[in-house]
Amino acid sequence: MKLRSDLTINGKLYRKGESAPKWFIYPFFLFHMGMFGLSGFLMAYASDGPDLAFLYMHGGIAITVYVVFYLAIFGLDEVRWMFINAGLGLFGIWVEIDWILSLFGKSLGDFPMAVHVTPFLYYILYTFLLRQMLLDLTRSRDKPGRKRMVEMLYVLGSLAVYG
């Protein structure tokens, strides 16, 4: 993965266009965002969770920071497509989060719409990161034929999960 802007990782400066250490970036962000996303999810859907202002501050600050890193790492075009695809995939996100809530005996309809903003944004950021990791693990980012195949498998896998 080639960086879209300068980024310092563990005190080492990586310049725009240089390859980033994907074995650091993906595990770090998957774990870090997983923890923040999980805490945001649990707070949003807890029986006696925090008020909406705290939920938005907790999630909003972290989500903003993640988007800034995504822009530096993946670039504006990829991040733009993340939000376009998220807009198109809201139904899938709705189904997936509703299924997760069902594991706790709850549903999306049990909460006001405003509560869903933070968990939905975390879901979008996390699935974007998974797709980027898959493109790099399969070395298909710069190979159009392989990239189309990997993306098709990603879409089919997502549809299987939504189904």
What do these predicted ranges mean?
Residues M1-G40:
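N-terminal juxtamembrane cytosolic/stromal segments of multi-pass membrane proteins
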Residues K2, M33, G60-Y66, P119-R131:
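Hydrophobic cores of alpha-helical transmembrane segments in multi-pass inner/ER membrane proteins
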Residues K12-A20, P50, K106-H116, M133-V150:
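Membrane-interface helix-loop-helix junctions at boundaries between adjacent transmembrane segments
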Residues K12-W23, A72-G89:
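Alpha-helical transmembrane segments of integral membrane proteins, especially early/N-terminal helices
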Residues S39-G59, G75-W81, I100-P119:
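Membrane-helix interface and helix-disruption motif detector
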Residues V67-F83, L129-K147:
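Cytoplasmic membrane-interface regions of multi-pass membrane proteins
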Residues G87-R131:
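C-terminal halves and exits of single transmembrane alpha-helices
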Residues K147-G163:
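Final/C-terminal transmembrane alpha-helix of multipass membrane proteins
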